[in-house]
Design a protein with these regions (language model features):
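Catalytic helix-loop patch of NAD(P)-dependent Rossmann-fold dehydrogenases
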Residues: 83-98, 111, 119-167, 174, ...
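N-terminal Rossmann NAD(P)H-binding glycine-rich loop of SDR-like oxidoreductase domains
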Residues: 4-24
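NAD(P)H-binding glycine-rich loop region in Rossmannoid oxidoreductase-like domains
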Residues: 51-91
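NAD(P)-dependent short-chain dehydrogenase/reductase
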Residues: 124-130, 152-213, 217-228
């Protein structure tokens, strides 16, 4: 049985990924979370790990000895990246650098999936659509910049230390159980509150001129599994 490690598995995507990997895929799964997070999952080994503490990363990888690693841990809120840029840089860049350093030091032979973001592209000229991996990155917020930096660091480590790293730029996810921090779930929550008479019949929205691709989270995690396996 193949063993996998999900780093940062207490979030929206991580929970779906854990269910899919233990269920349909039949992997032996370990999941890391922050100490203050609550995560109960009978079919996986749950481990507390601070990504900013390199020694904890070393201990977890030694304990789990995974064949595949899914690196989901991130500060993923664009709004929070503006109000707390230091946290965003620490988690998304310094935390990932800790992981990369440990992978280098132990000469990790397995495959690692690092999750970037469609936000990295930023402003895209109409003539550049449809975009590809070669489209110029013009990140327009701090979160996007940290994700771009994460993936550039990973590319350097992959070449310099022969690490098997796969990087994706995932666009917006949607699905049941998503936090109202995100746009679709926020709109849905407001609609339900209006229908229940809990608020005035007005939906508060942000910039409606932005165009984004949305993917069901269940399709996203199936694609992630394919990327580490094939």
């Amino acid at each position: 049985m193949k063993k996998v490690l999900i780093i940062g598995g207490a979030g929206f995507v991580g929970r779906y990924l854990a269910e899919y990997l233990t269920g349909e895929c039949g992997y032996e799964v370990s999941i890391t979370k922050m100490k203050q997070e609550v995560l109960e999952y009978a079919d996986a080994d749950i481990l507390d790990m601070d990504l900013l503490a390199k020694e904890e990363v070393e201990q977890v990888l030694a304990k789990c000895a995974p064949d595949y690693i899914f690196h989901l841990a991130a500060q993923s809120s664009v709004a929070l990246s503006w109000s707390n840029p230091q946290l965003t840089v620490d988690v998304n860049i310094k935390g990932t650098l800790n992981l990369l350093d440990v992978l280098k030091e132990i000469k990790y032979p397995g495959r690692v999936l690092l999750i970037g973001s469609g936000e990295e592209y930023g402003y895209v000229n109409p003539e550049e659509v449809p975009i590809s991996e070669d489209t110029v990155l013009r990140p327009g917020n701090i979160y996007a910049a940290t994700k771009g930096c994460q993936n550039m660091l990973a590319a350097i480590y992959a070449r310099a230390y022969q690490l098997n790293l796969v990087m994706v730029r995932a666009f917006n996810h949607v699905g049941p159980r998503q936090s109202p921090q995100f746009v679709v779930s926020d709109f849905c929550k407001q609609v339900v509150e209006v229908e229940k008479g809990l608020r005035e019949p007005v939906i508060h929205v942000g910039n409606l001129k932005a165009k984004r691709d949305f993917t069901d989270v269940r399709d996203v995690i199936a694609a992630y599994e394919c990327l580490v396996r094939q």
